[in-house]
Amino acid sequence: MPNMLEIYKCNHCGNMVEVMAGGGAPLVCCGEEMELQVEGTVDAAKEKHVPVIEKTANGFLVKVGAVEHPMTDKHWIQWIELIADGRSYTKFLNPGETPEAEFCIKADKVTAREYCNLHGHWKTEL
C-alpha cells in the first residue's frame, strides 16, 4: 500500500510517481505493480550520492554528494527534493547542470532526497 511521499517507478517505461496521499491499492503501470524506491539500497558510491545539506542565510543549499556527482547524458541526478514542515520542494535537473539546489525556506528540521538515473534514490536529514 503506497504511503505519502513514497517514490515508485515502473520498471518497464520508467514512469516515476511521488505519492501525495496514500491509498489502499497498489500503483500499477504497464500492467505491473510499480516498484517502491527505497533510499540508499543500490550498491553505489555513497560519497557521490548522499545529499549534503548546508544551512544558508536564505534557507538551505542541497548538493549531491560530498564528491560532486557527474551530470552526463548517461548518468545524472534527475531531481533534488527538500521536505520540511509537511511541505515538499523539488528542483528538476538536466545533464550538464550542477547537481545542487537552493531552497529559500525557514525550517528547523529538513530531509533532502535525490534521484540518480542509474543508482536510484538517496536521502539525508539535518
Swiss-Prot record:
Keyword presence, Transport: yes
GO molecular function terms attached to this record: iron ion binding; superoxide reductase activity
Pfam family, one: Desulfoferrodox
GO biological process, one term: removal of superoxide radicals
Signal sequence extent: none
The protein's required cofactors: Fe(3+); Cu(2+)
Protein residues bound to Fe cation 1: C10, C13, C29, C30
Record-listed Fe cation 2 binding positions: H49, H69, H75, C116, H119
Gene3D superfamilies: Desulphoferrodoxin, N-terminal domain, SOR catalytic domain
UniProt keyword list: Detoxification, Electron transport, Iron, Metal-binding, Oxidoreductase, Transport
Coiled-coil blocks: none
Keyword hit for DNA-binding: no
Enzyme Commission code: 1.15.1.2
Cofactor binding mode and count: Binds 1 Fe(3+) ion per subunit. The iron ion 1 is coordinated via 4 cysteine residues.
InterPro entries registered for this protein in UniProt: Desulfoferrodoxin_Fe-bd_dom (IPR002742), Desulfoferrodoxin_Fe-bd_dom_sf (IPR036073), Desulfoferrodoxin_N (IPR004462), Desulfoferrodoxin_N_sf (IPR038094), Desulfoferrodoxin_rbo (IPR004793), Desulfoferrodoxin_SOR (IPR051233)
SUPFAM superfamilies cross-referenced by the UniProt entry: Rubredoxin-like, Superoxide reductase-like
Catalytic activity as recorded in UniProt: reduced [rubredoxin] + superoxide + 2 H(+) = oxidized [rubredoxin] + H2O2
Domain comment quoted from the record: Is organized in two protein domains. The N-terminal domain has a fold similar to that of desulforedoxin and contains a mononuclear Fe(3+) ion, center I. The second domain contains a different mononuclear iron center, center II, with a Fe(2+) ion.
Extra remark: Catalysis occurs at center II. Fe(2+) ion of center II is the electron donor and is converted to the Fe(3+) form during the reaction.
Similarity annotation: Belongs to the desulfoferrodoxin family.
Complex and partners: Homodimer.
PANTHER family: SUPEROXIDE REDUCTASE-RELATED
Job of this protein: Catalyzes the one-electron reduction of superoxide anion radical to hydrogen peroxide at a nonheme ferrous iron center. Plays a fundamental role in case of oxidative stress via its superoxide detoxification activity.
Alphabetized NCBIfam families for the sequence: desulf_FeS4 (TIGR00319), dfx_rbo (TIGR00320), neela_ferrous (TIGR00332)
Descriptive protein name: Desulfoferrodoxin
Organism: Oleidesulfovibrio alaskensis (strain ATCC BAA-1058 / DSM 17464 / G20)
Gene: dfx
